[in-house]
Amino acid sequence: SSWGAFNIMSSALNNQNINLEIVKIAEGISIGFEITPLGAIFGLVASFLWIFAAIYSVGYMRGNNEKNQTRFYAFYAIAVHAALCIAYAGDLLTLFIFYEVLTFSTYPLVTHKQNEMAQKAGRLYMSILVGSSVILLLPAIIWVWVATGSLEMSQNGVLDGKIDVAYAPLLLAMFVFGIGKAALMPIHKWLPAAMVAPTPVSALLHAVAVVKAGVFTMLIVLTNVFGIDFLAKTGASEWLIWLASFTLLATSIIAIYKDDLKARLAYSTISQLSYITLGGALATSMATQGAALHIITHAAGKITLFFVAGALYVGAKITKISDLNGHGKSASLIFLAFFIGSLSIIGVPPMAGSWSKFFLMLGAADSGYEVVIGVFCISTILNAFYLMEIPARAFFFKKEREVSVKIPKLILIPTLITSFLT
């Protein structure tokens, strides 16, 4: 699938028009696929990182002696392929169908441990993601069909001249809060709750498929349904700029106070997703490019950080940041990978994450929202504070207890490779 995604990306870069209609239900309503530049980017990221996630998951599941591994791998594969179908969806109906397939296929992964905490997390996961999509996203899609007579999308948007400008912010709100996978406040609580799942699932949720499908869908709606020119002209996304900015900063502050490593990374993810939503809401070409690039850079960086969290659990049964003191020498390569991945998430030049943040800042300046540049800068400081604490504790704090750290090679190798992709 990675080679196919690479060929699709090449076709998109060469402006080749590739589309496939599977079923035509009615005029303007069909199930089919079409290659867009943004979809090609998401498809390539998901399929490429899945290789390392799959290898890592074998090492993790075996190293941790997890039960029901066959079921786990089956749903893991279904989830990734659902994400690819979202990436290449040619219309809103196809997008919605595979958006739901992704939700239902990841539920068994979230509840894999089958204990009370996993079941509770699974109920919250399904209630928020399915509830938001059925109550808000589906009606929003129907509204677009009523307004335009079609569920097809366009690179310039489809709503200009088709909808009363006064109703545009309301329709956008239905889409934004209907796309629960983008994890904007206040519909973000499913993501930290889902951290009870095995670490390969966390990597799938945060880097490869689920949340990336959410922000990809958000960008598609902002650019290919509304259109950045329509948003800039009407100001329909102004409220979203402030909501995304608030989410970005608030979750960064919350992350600082989380001692559980996966919980801290979960709130970090919510913050980083808001960068992408904010880039789309700014409604400039530069900001949109920055948002698309941030999908790539955050995916590589965050999958590395979660790989490290899983490695520490399998190798030393460490889950708390406060328990990392002095263990840097016994797991130096793992903490080096975390350090490199963190530099990219923070946005330290010349790491990949610095380029996406640079384009986002340029986009903020182009849009006239200079205050957003300040939001990005404050967030970067907060990122450094809550991420650099981990390697700092490992290498510079005094060891409080002796722990034997043994990292399986199937965990170590993918972690090191993804760290160098950042």
Regions flagged by a language model, labelled:
Residues 1, 44, 129-133, 242, ...:
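Hydrophobic H-region at the start of alpha-helical membrane spans
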Residues 13-42, 92-95, 99-110, 178, ...:
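Membrane-interface helix-loop-helix modules in multi-pass inner-membrane proteins
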Residues 1-74, 149-158, 220:
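Transmembrane helix-loop-helix hairpins at membrane boundaries of multipass inner-membrane proteins
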Residues 23, 358-363, 400-407:
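Short, membrane-exposed interhelical loops at transmembrane-helix boundaries
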Residues 3-14, 138-145, 345-348, 422:
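C-terminal TM-helix exit segments that contain a strictly Trp-centered aromatic cap at the helix terminus
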Residues 47, 210, 353-356, 414-418:
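Core segments of transmembrane alpha-helices
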Residues 52-62, 67-70, 76-95, 105-358, ...:
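Hydrophobic transmembrane alpha-helices and their helix-loop junctions in integral membrane proteins
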